[in-house]
Amino acid sequence: MLFTLKKGELFGRLIAIGRVIVGIYAFLAALCFMSMVITGTAAFDALCLSLSGVATGGLTPQSAPISAYVGRVSSVILAIFCFFGAMNIAIIWDALRLRRWRNIYALIRNVEHRGLLAIAMFISIFGFFFVGFSQAFTIIIESLYFVSSAGFDYNVIGIELLPPVILIAIALVGGSALSTSGGVKIIRVLLLFRHLNTDMSRLSHPSRVVPVSFKKQHIPDRAFLSIWMYFFGYTLFFAFSIMALGATGFTFEDAVATGAASLSNIGPLLPATLPESGLTYADFSPVQKLISAMFMLIGRVEVLAVLVLFTPSFWAR
């Protein structure tokens, strides 16, 4: 186990893991960059978008929508690599290292990746009812950008026409574990639903022994305790963000949208959920920017590690 290694072995293992992660993301970013340049995107724009897309950061070299300076083919390429950024990096590493069909097929067969595709399809199909099939390409592309938590804005008319509650819920769920995407992560949500289903079965049959299994593996109760603690911590920080932003003068709707955008690290979620208010980050006061940045950092690191800082036992000698 990693935490039972000696100090020298621990740092050696961390360096080895770091090299693998850097190598994978450098390879994907370089491949995305070359593909976008070949399909007609300017080199500087392609460089910025490829680095931001694979890292699901959502930063763009221009303030205009992506459709204003990137062609359709390049937009599809960027969406694909954003989706790679939201995938489990361990499974990507196995596929690249072993280079066997069954390992490549595992990228698609993985339950988290199928969940990402299902969410993207849900956004696309749901979006057709609001914007029509004339904007089908925009909805499909923006759904891939959104589920990866990159959140690029492809066109002026897109997913911002969808109900804000749906967008916020999807943003808080996030992407795959061991990925650069934000949110609670799909695997945790799936396990929580599996555990909830088992508990409901125990209510109807109290004496029945119902072990919880996932992907043919038994999941111990202590694992679910950690997941529930993470979910509680994430929900708690979301509530804190709403209260903190509300105390600065935000309306409840503005505070919820900003808190969700900050914790999930999807900046464009704010204008997407509040298009009629016209609220942007440029309108924030210094205090509001500081609060938003703080919860962005909390959403990017391990929530439980931050939550421990607020316990008296951590500061006790």
Task: Please describe what each predicted stretch is.
Residues M1-R317:
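Membrane-proximal intracellular helices of multi-pass ion channels
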